[in-house]
Amino acid sequence: MNGASVKVYSVANDGSKQVSAHFKVREFQCHDKSDTVFISDALVTVLEKIRAHFGKPVHINSGYRTDAYNSRTKDAAKFSQHKYGLAADIHIDGVTPKEIAAYAEKLLPNTGGIGIYKSFCHVDVRKAKSRWNG
């Protein structure tokens, strides 16, 4: 999984469109409410597997980010995977970020980014492997 296939959507036209069984385009929209949204097919696959494993909805705190929004986001990486549609910051009610990260590690043992934060887990499908605590 390397995020190679990234699709571009318009929230105005596609916001209610299902990108998978449990996720809609609008869930990945940048917090600045820009219309364009980039979403990686591989990322959606990982999120669906996480949802199936825990048997609970996965909530996306932050999906796609525009360059402008990312530059205003505290502690965001200059080349954040969110800017390319390859990342999501997620939480699951009743599941710790550490538990989410442990399962994501099984899905992405040699690739992808997994970051553990106090209230969410960052998951991305970059080609290289990266792990951190926020």
Which ranges hold each PLM region?
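Extended, low-complexity, intrinsically disordered C-terminal regulatory tails
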Residues: 44-75
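Extracytoplasmic cell-surface/polysaccharide-interacting catalytic and binding patches
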Residues: 1-53, 116-118, 126-134
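Generic alpha-helical scaffold signal
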Residues: 33, 37-44, 63, 67, ...
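A generic short-segment signal for beta-strand/edge and adjacent turn/coil regions
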Residues: 28-30, 53-62, 89-94
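Catalytic cores and adjacent binding grooves of peptidoglycan-active enzymes
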Residues: 5, 78-134
